[in-house]
Amino acid sequence: HEGRELFLVRDPLGLVAEGYALDARLGPLLARLDGAATINDLQAEWMRQDCSALASSEDIQTLAAGFDAAFLLDSPAFRQARDKVVADFAARSTRPAFLAGKAYPAQPGALAALLDEILDGGEEGRSSGQPVGPLPRALVAPHIDLAAGREAYARAYGALRGHKPRRVVVLGVGHGLGNGLFSLTAKTFPTPLGRTASDTAAVERLRQAGGQVVAPDDFAHRGEHSIEFQLLFL
């Protein structure tokens, strides 16, 4: 930007201000702020990056305080703010439609028309709404943008047209999983076409059976698109 190399910070928690950019020369210095480096170590790193001929201990402390205020350090302040964001989401009974109006229409009529157009484009979907085969036991569907994956979506969910399964288990890709291998949620998922309720009893049974492989919270679902896209078709 304007001849300067910058790092643009993207924070899924939403703590770092949108559009926050960091001078690329400060990257190695930021990496050294691990609690083990001394002020002298950080001054030497500063000089190696040619940020300045010399930085006082006050300069380093001011810089570190700025990083901390921006939530770029794994500090008590960051952990407190992170825990509040996670707890606030955990307290919700619903998981809002994160991508409505961004990746697909937020208006029910426009979304229904788009889904019908996608489903009618696949061989499995060319019917009058009657089942074209037995109820599938499992489906493999994409979790990409609807327009980019329309053919694969049509082939997958066209096979469900005319069927009304009693229960659907949706296993989505977790792009932002932290702790655990799986993240379960009992939240209701509102969509422009209606609300999709979770089987809370079944979710709790899975949670108990999963033990330590299940994440202690469901925060990974907040901005995750892989399940949100499936629910539009379901």
Question: Language-model segments: which ranges?
Answer:
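Long, charge-rich, low-complexity alpha-helical segments
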Residues: 4-5, 12-105, 109
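Short acidic/polar alpha-helix capping motifs at helix-coil junctions
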Residues: 6-8, 234
